[in-house]
Amino acid sequence: MAEEPTYTAEQVNDVVHAGLGTVDFFLSRPVDGQSSLGKGSVPPGITAVLTNAAELKAKTAAAAPVKPKRKKIQHMTPAYTIADNGDPNRLPANTPIANPLIPIERPPGRMTDLDLATGTVTQGTYKGVELAKAGKNALLTRFSSGPSLTDQASSKDPNFKRGGEIDGRHKGRHRREWSIAWVGDEVKVYEWCNPTCAPVTATDRKFSCTCGTCPDRCGECEGDN
Protein backbone atom coordinates (compact mmCIF):
# COMPACT_ATOMS: atom_id res chain seq x y z
CA MET A 1 0.00 0.00 0.00
CA ALA A 2 1.10 3.50 -0.82
CA GLU A 3 1.86 5.62 2.10
CA GLU A 4 -0.52 8.53 2.73
CA PRO A 5 1.13 11.92 2.28
CA THR A 6 1.87 13.77 5.42
CA TYR A 7 1.76 17.54 5.83
CA THR A 8 3.50 19.67 8.32
CA ALA A 9 1.58 22.11 10.45
CA GLU A 10 3.07 24.97 8.47
CA GLN A 11 1.75 23.54 5.14
CA VAL A 12 -1.74 23.03 6.60
CA ASN A 13 -1.83 26.62 7.82
CA ASP A 14 -0.85 27.87 4.35
CA VAL A 15 -3.71 25.93 2.71
CA VAL A 16 -6.25 27.17 5.26
CA HIS A 17 -5.14 30.79 4.93
CA ALA A 18 -5.31 30.57 1.11
CA GLY A 19 -8.85 29.16 1.25
CA LEU A 20 -10.04 31.80 3.70
CA GLY A 21 -8.53 34.50 1.53
CA THR A 22 -10.50 33.24 -1.48
CA VAL A 23 -13.75 33.19 0.52
CA ASP A 24 -13.18 36.70 1.85
CA PHE A 25 -12.48 37.95 -1.68
CA PHE A 26 -15.83 36.77 -3.08
CA LEU A 27 -17.82 37.79 0.00
CA SER A 28 -16.57 41.35 -0.35
CA ARG A 29 -17.91 41.66 -3.95
CA PRO A 30 -21.54 41.79 -5.22
CA VAL A 31 -22.66 38.44 -6.60
CA ASP A 32 -24.68 38.17 -9.84
CA GLY A 33 -26.44 34.82 -9.91
CA GLN A 34 -26.72 34.85 -13.74
CA SER A 35 -23.04 35.46 -14.48
CA SER A 36 -20.19 32.97 -14.44
CA LEU A 37 -16.76 33.40 -12.89
CA GLY A 38 -14.14 34.51 -15.33
CA LYS A 39 -10.52 33.52 -15.08
CA GLY A 40 -9.51 37.09 -14.31
CA SER A 41 -11.84 37.26 -11.29
CA VAL A 42 -10.20 34.30 -9.55
CA PRO A 43 -7.40 35.39 -7.18
CA PRO A 44 -4.05 33.63 -7.40
CA GLY A 45 -3.39 30.72 -5.07
CA ILE A 46 -4.59 27.12 -4.84
CA THR A 47 -7.62 27.70 -7.14
CA ALA A 48 -6.93 25.39 -10.06
CA VAL A 49 -10.39 23.78 -9.80
CA LEU A 50 -12.22 27.12 -10.02
CA THR A 51 -10.06 28.28 -12.91
CA ASN A 52 -10.60 25.10 -14.93
CA ALA A 53 -14.36 25.22 -14.32
CA ALA A 54 -14.57 28.83 -15.52
CA GLU A 55 -12.58 28.06 -18.68
CA LEU A 56 -14.73 24.99 -19.44
CA LYS A 57 -17.95 27.00 -19.09
CA ALA A 58 -16.61 29.74 -21.37
CA LYS A 59 -15.63 27.21 -24.07
CA THR A 60 -19.04 25.49 -23.88
CA ALA A 61 -20.88 28.80 -24.30
CA ALA A 62 -18.73 29.76 -27.29
CA ALA A 63 -19.33 26.41 -29.01
CA ALA A 64 -23.13 26.55 -28.58
CA PRO A 65 -25.09 27.13 -31.82
CA VAL A 66 -26.33 30.66 -32.35
CA LYS A 67 -30.05 30.88 -33.10
CA PRO A 68 -30.82 33.11 -36.07
CA LYS A 69 -32.92 36.17 -35.33
CA ARG A 70 -36.36 36.27 -36.84
CA LYS A 71 -36.94 39.00 -39.36
CA LYS A 72 -39.87 41.27 -38.67
CA ILE A 73 -42.45 40.92 -41.42
CA GLN A 74 -43.67 44.26 -42.73
CA HIS A 75 -47.14 44.13 -44.23
CA MET A 76 -47.60 46.23 -47.34
CA THR A 77 -50.66 48.21 -46.24
CA PRO A 78 -51.77 50.81 -48.75
CA ALA A 79 -51.88 54.35 -47.46
CA TYR A 80 -55.26 55.95 -46.95
CA THR A 81 -56.15 59.21 -48.68
CA ILE A 82 -58.24 61.72 -46.76
CA ALA A 83 -60.55 63.73 -48.99
CA ASP A 84 -60.26 67.51 -48.91
CA ASN A 85 -63.34 69.36 -47.69
CA GLY A 86 -62.53 72.42 -49.77
CA ASP A 87 -64.77 74.06 -52.34
CA PRO A 88 -65.13 71.66 -55.33
CA ASN A 89 -65.60 74.67 -57.65
CA ARG A 90 -61.95 75.61 -57.07
CA LEU A 91 -60.63 72.24 -58.26
CA PRO A 92 -58.88 72.12 -61.64
CA ALA A 93 -60.97 71.11 -64.62
CA ASN A 94 -61.54 67.37 -65.17
CA THR A 95 -60.36 66.52 -61.64
CA PRO A 96 -61.70 63.03 -60.81
CA ILE A 97 -63.41 62.80 -57.40
CA ALA A 98 -63.52 59.27 -56.01
CA ASN A 99 -66.91 58.01 -54.85
CA PRO A 100 -67.25 54.42 -53.57
CA LEU A 101 -70.92 54.30 -54.62
CA ILE A 102 -70.20 54.96 -58.30
CA PRO A 103 -67.92 52.47 -60.10
CA ILE A 104 -65.37 53.85 -62.53
CA GLU A 105 -66.55 51.48 -65.28
CA ARG A 106 -70.23 50.76 -65.91
CA PRO A 107 -72.13 48.54 -68.30
CA PRO A 108 -74.09 50.22 -71.10
CA GLY A 109 -77.09 51.96 -69.56
CA ARG A 110 -78.68 55.30 -68.69
CA MET A 111 -78.06 57.80 -65.89
CA THR A 112 -80.76 59.92 -64.26
CA ASP A 113 -79.63 63.03 -62.31
CA LEU A 114 -82.00 64.78 -59.89
CA ASP A 115 -80.84 67.96 -58.13
CA LEU A 116 -81.99 67.92 -54.50
CA ALA A 117 -81.95 71.71 -54.13
CA THR A 118 -83.95 72.66 -57.23
CA GLY A 119 -85.65 69.37 -58.12
CA THR A 120 -84.34 69.67 -61.67
CA VAL A 121 -83.90 66.46 -63.64
CA THR A 122 -80.87 66.75 -65.90
CA GLN A 123 -81.54 63.61 -67.90
CA GLY A 124 -82.96 60.15 -67.48
CA THR A 125 -86.02 57.95 -67.93
CA TYR A 126 -89.42 57.90 -66.30
CA LYS A 127 -88.47 54.99 -64.06
CA GLY A 128 -85.18 56.64 -63.14
CA VAL A 129 -86.96 59.89 -62.21
CA GLU A 130 -89.45 58.04 -60.00
CA LEU A 131 -86.64 56.23 -58.20
CA ALA A 132 -84.62 59.44 -57.85
CA LYS A 133 -87.62 61.20 -56.26
CA ALA A 134 -88.10 58.28 -53.89
CA GLY A 135 -84.40 58.43 -53.07
CA LYS A 136 -84.67 62.16 -52.40
CA ASN A 137 -87.62 61.65 -50.04
CA ALA A 138 -85.79 58.86 -48.26
CA LEU A 139 -82.75 61.10 -47.79
CA LEU A 140 -84.81 64.00 -46.42
CA THR A 141 -86.94 61.83 -44.11
CA ARG A 142 -84.45 59.17 -43.10
CA PHE A 143 -84.60 60.27 -39.44
CA SER A 144 -88.39 60.39 -39.34
CA SER A 145 -90.94 57.62 -38.99
CA GLY A 146 -92.29 58.07 -42.51
CA PRO A 147 -92.42 55.39 -45.20
CA SER A 148 -89.08 54.00 -46.31
CA LEU A 149 -87.62 54.02 -49.81
CA THR A 150 -88.59 50.39 -50.29
CA ASP A 151 -92.20 51.06 -49.29
CA GLN A 152 -92.52 54.06 -51.61
CA ALA A 153 -91.06 52.28 -54.61
CA SER A 154 -92.76 48.93 -54.09
CA SER A 155 -96.17 50.60 -53.67
CA LYS A 156 -95.98 51.79 -57.28
CA ASP A 157 -94.28 48.76 -58.79
CA PRO A 158 -94.43 45.32 -57.08
CA ASN A 159 -91.48 44.19 -59.21
CA PHE A 160 -89.28 47.15 -58.22
CA LYS A 161 -86.76 44.83 -56.56
CA ARG A 162 -84.01 43.87 -58.95
CA GLY A 163 -84.72 40.46 -60.35
CA GLY A 164 -88.43 40.44 -59.46
CA GLU A 165 -90.17 37.09 -59.35
CA ILE A 166 -90.99 35.49 -62.69
CA ASP A 167 -94.26 33.56 -62.84
CA GLY A 168 -94.30 30.20 -64.55
CA ARG A 169 -91.53 28.70 -66.62
CA HIS A 170 -88.43 30.71 -67.45
CA LYS A 171 -88.70 32.67 -70.68
CA GLY A 172 -85.77 34.37 -72.32
CA ARG A 173 -86.06 38.09 -71.76
CA HIS A 174 -84.33 41.01 -70.05
CA ARG A 175 -84.45 42.24 -66.46
CA ARG A 176 -84.06 45.96 -65.76
CA GLU A 177 -81.73 46.77 -62.87
CA TRP A 178 -81.14 50.02 -60.98
CA SER A 179 -78.42 51.50 -58.77
CA ILE A 180 -79.09 54.58 -56.58
CA ALA A 181 -76.35 56.83 -55.17
CA TRP A 182 -76.13 60.26 -53.54
CA VAL A 183 -73.35 62.51 -54.86
CA GLY A 184 -73.21 65.96 -53.31
CA ASP A 185 -76.65 67.56 -53.79
CA GLU A 186 -77.74 65.12 -56.48
CA VAL A 187 -79.44 61.74 -56.59
CA LYS A 188 -78.01 59.58 -59.36
CA VAL A 189 -79.95 56.57 -60.63
CA TYR A 190 -78.19 54.28 -63.06
CA GLU A 191 -80.13 51.61 -64.96
CA TRP A 192 -79.22 48.82 -67.35
CA CYS A 193 -80.51 45.49 -68.61
CA ASN A 194 -79.38 41.95 -67.84
CA PRO A 195 -80.74 38.63 -69.12
CA THR A 196 -83.15 36.96 -66.69
CA CYS A 197 -80.93 33.88 -66.54
CA ALA A 198 -78.06 35.97 -65.06
CA PRO A 199 -77.54 36.20 -61.29
CA VAL A 200 -78.50 39.32 -59.33
CA THR A 201 -75.41 40.97 -57.80
CA ALA A 202 -74.73 44.06 -55.69
CA THR A 203 -72.43 45.56 -58.34
CA ASP A 204 -73.24 47.27 -61.62
CA ARG A 205 -72.34 44.45 -63.96
CA LYS A 206 -73.46 43.35 -67.40
CA PHE A 207 -73.91 39.59 -67.86
CA SER A 208 -74.23 37.48 -70.99
CA CYS A 209 -77.10 35.08 -71.64
CA THR A 210 -76.39 31.49 -70.56
CA CYS A 211 -79.71 29.87 -71.51
CA GLY A 212 -79.59 30.80 -75.20
CA THR A 213 -83.13 32.25 -75.29
CA CYS A 214 -82.62 35.82 -74.03
CA PRO A 215 -82.51 38.54 -76.72
CA ASP A 216 -79.50 40.77 -77.28
CA ARG A 217 -81.66 43.91 -77.09
CA CYS A 218 -85.07 44.68 -75.69
CA GLY A 219 -87.39 47.67 -75.77
CA GLU A 220 -85.91 49.13 -72.57
CA CYS A 221 -82.22 48.88 -73.44
CA GLU A 222 -82.50 50.11 -77.03
CA GLY A 223 -81.53 53.62 -75.95
CA ASP A 224 -78.76 52.62 -73.53
CA ASN A 225 -75.30 53.95 -74.23
UniProtKB/Swiss-Prot annotation:
Belongs to the paramyxoviruses V protein family. The keyword S-adenosyl-L-methionine does not apply. Residues 145-157 have a biased composition (Polar residues). Plays an essential role in the inhibition of host immune response. Prevents the establishment of cellular antiviral state by blocking interferon-alpha/beta (IFN-alpha/beta) production and signaling pathway. Interacts with host IFIH1/MDA5 and DHX58/LGP2 to inhibit the transduction pathway involved in the activation of IFN-beta promoter, thus protecting the virus against cell antiviral state. Efficiently blocks type I and type II IFN signaling following infection, probably by targeting host STAT1 for proteasomal degradation. Disulfide bonds: none annotated. Zn(2+) 1 binds at residues 174, 193, 218, 221. The keyword Transmembrane does not apply. Zn(2+) 2 binds at residues 197, 209, 211, 214. GO terms for molecular function: metal ion binding. It comes from Simian virus 41. One of its GO terms (cellular component) is host cell cytoplasm. The gene is P/V. InterPro entries: Paramyx_V_Zn-bd, Soyouz_module. Keywords: Host cytoplasm, Host-virus interaction, Inhibition of host innate immune response by virus, Inhibition of host interferon signaling pathway by virus, Inhibition of host MDA5 by virus, Inhibition of host RLR pathway by virus, Inhibition of host STAT1 by virus, Interferon antiviral system evasion, Metal-binding, Viral immunoevasion, Zinc. Pfam families: Soyouz_module, zf-Paramyx-P. One of its GO terms (biological process) is symbiont-mediated suppression of host type I interferon-mediated signaling pathway. Residues 145-172 are annotated as: Disordered. It is found in: Host cytoplasm. This is Non-structural protein V. It comes from the Viruses.
